[in-house]
């Protein structure tokens, strides 16, 4: 598996997830972790939430837990680094067809929204740019394509949508991670 400083490999993580009986792809798991982080998670509760959502509340084996902790740390560092280093974990164009990549992006977005909703339970009340981005993500999660469509055109469109998703995730992180965001029920002293 990857080390703390090298990026997580999509195919390797997907294989480990399958071996451990977790019915998520690497894209879906990264989307879930990203959603939790962008929703404001700042403690070890993320692992319990992931166990509950993906493994019937049972802890993962060390063989899976360690790579997920590395991925969580890498994702958190990229989001908090302030250098726009955050990237979606999706299969590369050399590793998957444009259709498989579109499916992976839709899966990433679905699980991102799940993680975000776990941390921010009032997403429907969020207004402004962040609210619009969340609405757009809901539409992107329903991403469809026509298999007769020109694959080069679809690949170009997919790149643009993936970049929009990346920016929307960073926007959500900026909104919810520092202050708890408008959907937080955390009391504040004034």
Curated annotation (Swiss-Prot):
Signal peptide: none annotated. Gene3D superfamilies: YgfB uncharacterised protein family UPF0149, PF03695. GO terms for cellular component: cytosol. PANTHER family: UPF0149 PROTEIN YGFB. Belongs to the UPF0149 family. This is UPF0149 protein NT01EI_3357. It comes from Edwardsiella ictaluri (strain 93-146).
């Amino acid at each position: 598996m990857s080390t703390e400083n090298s990026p997580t490999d999509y195919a390797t993580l997907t294989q480990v997830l399958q071996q451990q009986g977790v019915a998520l792809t690497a894209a879906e798991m990264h989307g879930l972790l990203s959603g939790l982080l962008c929703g404001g998670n700042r403690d070890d509760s993320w692992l319990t939430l992931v166990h509950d959502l993906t493994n019937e509340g049972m802890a993962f084996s060390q063989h899976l837990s360690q790579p997920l902790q590395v991925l969580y740390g890498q994702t958190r560092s990229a989001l908090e680094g302030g250098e726009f280093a955050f990237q979606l974990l999706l299969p590369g164009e050399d590793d998957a067809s444009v259709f498989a990549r579109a499916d992976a992006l839709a899966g990433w977005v679905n699980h991102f929204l799940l993680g975000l909703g776990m941390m921010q339970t009032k997403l429907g009340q969020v207004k402004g740019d962040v609210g619009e981005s969340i609405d757009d993500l809901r539409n992107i999660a329903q991403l469809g394509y026509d298999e007769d469509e020109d694959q080069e055109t679809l690949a170009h469109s997919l790149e643009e949508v993936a970049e929009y998703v990346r920016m929307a995730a960073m926007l959500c992180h900026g909104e919810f991670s520092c202050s708890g965001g408008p959907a937080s029920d955390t009391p504040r002293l004034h």
